[in-house]
Amino acid sequence: MRIGILTIGNELITGRIKDANASYIAREMNIQGWRVPILMSVDDDEAAIKTALDHILGMADAVIVTGGLGPTADDKTTAAVARAYGLKLYRDEAVLRRIRGIFERYGFHWAPGNDKQADFPEGAELIANPVGTAWGFSLNVQGKLIAVLPGVPGELRRMLPEGVLPILRRMFPAAVSAVATRTFKLTGISEAEVDSKLADADLEGQGVEVGFYPDFPELRLVLTVRKKTEAEAQSILKNAEAQAVQRLERQIFACDDETLEGAVAALLTERKLTLAVAESCTGGLITDRLTDISGSSVFLERGAVTYSNLAKTELLGVPESILGEHGAVSEPTARLMAEGVRRLGHTDLGLATTGIAGPTGGTEQKPLGTVFIALADGRETLCRHYHFRWGDRRRVKVATSQAALMMLKRYLAAGSAPKK
């Protein structure tokens, strides 16, 4: 089955906000095994909305529309859809009472324009909004479905699975199939390299759809299998997963919704190890990512941003002679930072970063993007030298935090043991 997507709003066309709804809907349709052949955005203009609907329904069996269901004058979607198909609007008194009840419950001021949120085209099937005031609706137009939802992401993400998907399955029962999917998250490898490593597996020849989705600093490899039965789809996917892991195990850091910091946190917690972090060029980004994980206080003892040479000396014990001879961005300094923060925090592990994020500060010997990452465990101190060839300061910081967490994950996954 083919599903078109139409997002409506002047704020989308002018670039004032990012269209998160379209990507969410497309992803959910893919999970259901339905294809999205077209995605359009138009402004809050009735003629533009009608033209877009006609065009999309010429290519798709159904269209999911978002936006323009609010109470203000520029919210024109309901009226535009009704006029496009020669339908009259009616006011649903039950919905109106519910909306008024929400305003009264929270003490909101009621403006006359709020009434229009209870207006719907005749013959529409209403789609309840459990978290807001803008209800959606669907219409069957000559065997094709138009489903209209509010543009507020939090409301849309409740109403699509609870309201729209059941209607689609009921209206197009033959289109319901089994879809099995797995997302691998990789780092430190390009799309071309992944494609080359998977070439001999011939996954597509086995009925597996292979998709590459760069999302800096990671690359997502998505494997999808569509079959008549769940058992058949899962069997083919399981075999494809094994082949992908065999070829890409070193670059894979997580699956599906798991994050790199989440994977690191799970390993630290499982092994009952503690960590202290000293950051220079990353400015606290590693610690920030780790503390996004609930319960991180179990393993994260402290994080120190030692940006200046004085901080490296006073807090971490890096000798001035080392800084003078090798510089702040060097392997000896990174090693001593990791050892120093481990000693300071009395932890099992110490992780440190130092580098030149740019756009200034680079030299011929140490160009922009030069980074050293060290990991100390009391037995040995590992150090890696990286050169991130981007002029963007933020990208260098993010890439460094990613490499540091990946270094830590590999250490933990290998079963290495710190000195107790």
From Swiss-Prot:
SMART domains: MoCF_biosynth. HAMAP family: CinA_B. Belongs to the CinA family. This is CinA-like protein. It comes from Syntrophus aciditrophicus (strain SB).
